[in-house]
């Protein structure tokens, strides 16, 4: 016959009471925190998986934010080009082609000066539009989005980051930065203004939008794993001069047309700056430049559509990850309440058992304390 001593009964009771207390505390904590576990030790496997999911959620959220920012930037760029190029309502048509065609009409030669002023104002409006911003960043400034990219200097030339983009007399000059220092190329040679413009036109601003962002052995971004968010204004509008020495930039062509028109002397019927044939040729080049910009406009639209679809994919990925996280971490309120009720019942039962296990003298002592 096994004899159960009072001390043995007390030890068993204390152990069971502690288990009931812990179960009650655990059930109460679950209901208050709405979480399945509050520490790694509670459920190591689930906690490890949850940590990985949280990491993926944070990365996906950052990628979605990057994608959304770039998308709005591209939408702003698209809208800007629409105001410049769009059909019969764009700045090029209203303030470029129409006044140019009107001025070159023999019956309107007397209005050439006025038409020239309209064209000049149109070119200035285009430059202002191309200095548009999204948030605090200039849209068409390439990788240097904190400074306005375009201007028209005192000599009447369009500049990009301070460099005249189509002045034949300065394109081959050595470029000097704000401190008067040249920039060296890969071979240690001083770069010319044209070479610097080429460099700016090719610069990149890579952003992680969930394409598998990765660096190569030299710490450079692998292009296929990121999105290049840099939009070069000169890449869109053109820069440099053609074989005839005429500007390729759309606004510069308009400024040159304005110079020719404003230089016409109606009284003597002479072209003091350029000639009629030059103006007619520039008008053709204006159309060609607008067509080239239209192709870049289409490219922007294609890239904006890609960003829009990528944003939808990132959102779907985030939602799927969040569902998995919720299944691991979040409680079912009904189950949690039932668990709490059961734990409370067990705890009360354990207390009730104590009245039969603990000697009456000890119970009386505990009541008197």
Residue ranges and their predicted role:
Residues 1-146, 262, 266-369:
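Amphipathic alpha-helical polymerization modules
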Residues 17, 28-31, 35, 127, ...:
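Polar, low-complexity export/assembly segments characteristic of proteins
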């Amino acid at each position: 016959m096994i004899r159960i001593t009072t001390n043995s009964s007390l030890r068993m009771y204390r152990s069971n009471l502690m288990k009931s207390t812990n179960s009650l505390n655990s059930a109460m904590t679950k209901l208050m925190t709405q979480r399945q576990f509050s520490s790694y030790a509670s459920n190591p496997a689930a906690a490890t998986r949850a940590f990985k999911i949280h990491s993926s959620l944070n990365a996906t959220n950052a990628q979605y934010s990057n994608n959304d920012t770039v998308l709005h930037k591209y939408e702003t760029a698209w809208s800007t080009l629409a105001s410049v190029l769009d059909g019969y309502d764009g700045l090029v048509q209203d303030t470029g082609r129409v006044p140019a065609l009107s001025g070159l009409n023999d019956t309107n030669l007397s209005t050439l000066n006025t038409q020239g002023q309209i064209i000049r104002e149109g070119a200035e409006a285009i430059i202002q539009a191309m200095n548009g911003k999204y948030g605090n960043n200039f849209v068409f400034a390439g990788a240097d989005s904190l400074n306005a990219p375009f201007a028209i200097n005192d000599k009447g030339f369009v500049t990009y980051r301070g460099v005249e983009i189509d002045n034949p007399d300065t394109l081959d000059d050595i470029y000097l930065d704000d401190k008067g220092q040249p920039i060296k190329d890969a071979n240690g040679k001083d770069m010319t203004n044209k070479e610097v413009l080429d460099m700016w036109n090719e610069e990149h601003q890579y952003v992680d939008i969930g394409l598998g962002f990765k660096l190569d052995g030299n710490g450079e971004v692998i292009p296929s794993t990121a999105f290049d968010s840099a939009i070069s204004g000169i890449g869109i509008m053109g820069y440099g001069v053609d074989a005839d020495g005429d500007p390729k930039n759309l606004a510069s062509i308009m400024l040159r047309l304005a110079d020719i028109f404003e230089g016409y002397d109606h009284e003597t019927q002479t072209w003091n700056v350029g000639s009629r044939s030059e103006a007619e040729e520039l008008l053709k080049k204006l159309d060609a430049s607008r067509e080239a910009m239209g192709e870049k406009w289409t490219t922007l639209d294609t890239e904006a559509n890609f960003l829009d679809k990528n944003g939808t994919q990132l959102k779907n990925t985030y939602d799927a990850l969040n569902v998995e996280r919720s299944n691991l971490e979040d409680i079912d309120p009904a189950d949690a309440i039932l668990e709490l009720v059961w734990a409370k019942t067990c705890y009360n039962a354990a207390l009730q058992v104590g009245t039969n296990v603990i000697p009456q003298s000890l119970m009386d002592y505990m009541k008197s304390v």
